Amino acid sequence: QECKCHGVSGSCTLKTCWVTLPHFREVGYALKDKYEQAVMVEAVRGRRHVVPTFLKLKIPQNNSKPAETDLVYVDRSPNFCEKDNATGSIGTYGRFCNRTSTQADSCELLCCGRGYKTFQYTRTGQCHCKFHWCC
């Protein structure tokens, strides 16, 4: 919730408050935490029901049903490191990576623990520069 005061010289004779969403980064961190703690479930059908009546944990822990706040999944995610024609994933083998990056192009993420070779290269080309005499 955020509030703003209205009044002469900053006095708070009238206060307006409204509900706001959390910052985008906070939402991202919360979703990532949920993703890392997601649980695999399977659908359970009632005796005469075609539609599943509830979900239960695939690997039971203390209780057999996931909490309402749990992030759940039915199928495991494919391994995007390896080529998989069934899912259309081309894998990451042979991709260029950035050794110093911490983003999606980092060698740590793209190489999937296989290691990587480093090399340097020089690129020459037109810079389309212009010289302007100013003084």
UniProtKB/Swiss-Prot annotation:
Database matches in Pfam families: wnt
GO biological process: canonical Wnt signaling pathway; cell fate commitment; neuron differentiation; positive regulation of JNK cascade
Record localization: Secreted, Extracellular space, Extracellular matrix
Location, primary (coarse class): secreted
Glycosylation site residues: 62, 85, 98
Entry PTM: Palmitoleoylation is required for efficient binding to frizzled receptors. Depalmitoleoylation leads to Wnt signaling pathway inhibition.
Name the record gives this protein: Protein Wnt-7c
Organism field: Xenopus laevis
